[in-house]
Amino acid sequence: MGGRDYTLYLFAALGSFLIVYIALPIIVIFTKQALDFRMLVKTIHDPLVIEALRNSLLTATATALISLLFGVPLGYVLARKDFRGKSLVQAIIDVPIVIPHSVVGIMLLVTFSNAILDSYKGIIAAMLFVSAPFAINSARDGFLAVDEKLEHVARTLGASKLRTFFSISLPIALPSIASGAIMAWARGISEVGAILIVAYYPKTAQVLVMEYFNNYGLRASRPISVILMGISLGIFVVLRWLIGKAKS
């Protein structure tokens, strides 16, 4: 009791290893690219890079919206209803997290064949498979945090179940749902393995990074990596900040 407890300091020291491990490569790649600024400027003005970035941003955004459209209702059902096979449904939702992404590409190609091959539909299909669990689980957790008594009060006052959902449940769960949408977007824009197999074209920035690295080496692929990472991190931070303000 009399001694000073250093437990938190110990835990902070241990945890700082991961912080440094994650932050260091980001700092290093930005620093090295800053020293090769001419290459960065040249890459930014490359029409192929611009188109690839546009493809990545548009398909990731479409994926996040589709994840919300179908994931929010499913998350509500999982939060409010106990039914036979619920554990199986939850397991199916989490399966994409553990499947290797190249295998995901093969699975989608075997299932849908030419319907998604080398198309925007294929890119979105690959992104959706790996990112949907984040939207669904975040929505479920958000609705679980909503006190059911509030919903019951609204129902006793004459509100329909649908009106109660939109006026009570959804607004309270919205921060968690928004976090899930951000994670779905981030997971989609970071996907490479499945997209390489399903839809090499139209080319996304992720695939272009791999192509440049394989064909031209590290120096050629680094500027695209920095640009994609900068855009992704910028959007991610801004959205997180907006959600934080909404919560407070």
Swiss-Prot record:
InterPro entries: MetI-like, MetI-like_sf, Mo/W_ABC_Transporter_Permease. Residues 1-9, 78-91, 137-164, 245-248 are cytoplasmic. Gene3D superfamilies: MetI-like. Keywords: Cell membrane, Membrane, Molybdenum, Transmembrane, Transmembrane helix, Transport. Residues 31-56, 113-115, 186-223 are extracellular. Its main location: membrane. GO terms for cellular component: plasma membrane. Residues 53-239 form the ABC transmembrane type-1 domain. It is a multi-pass membrane protein. It holds the Pfam family BPD_transp_1. It is found in: Cell membrane. One of its GO terms (biological process) is transmembrane transport. The chain crosses the membrane at residues 10-30, 57-77, 92-112, 116-136, 165-185, 224-244. Coiled coil: none annotated. The keyword Ligase does not apply. Belongs to the binding-protein-dependent transport system permease family. The complex is composed of two ATP-binding proteins (WtpC), two transmembrane proteins (WtpB) and a solute-binding protein (WtpA). Part of the ABC transporter complex WtpABC involved in molybdate/tungstate import. Probably responsible for the translocation of the substrate across the membrane. This is Molybdate/tungstate transport system permease protein WtpB. It comes from Pyrococcus abyssi (strain GE5 / Orsay).
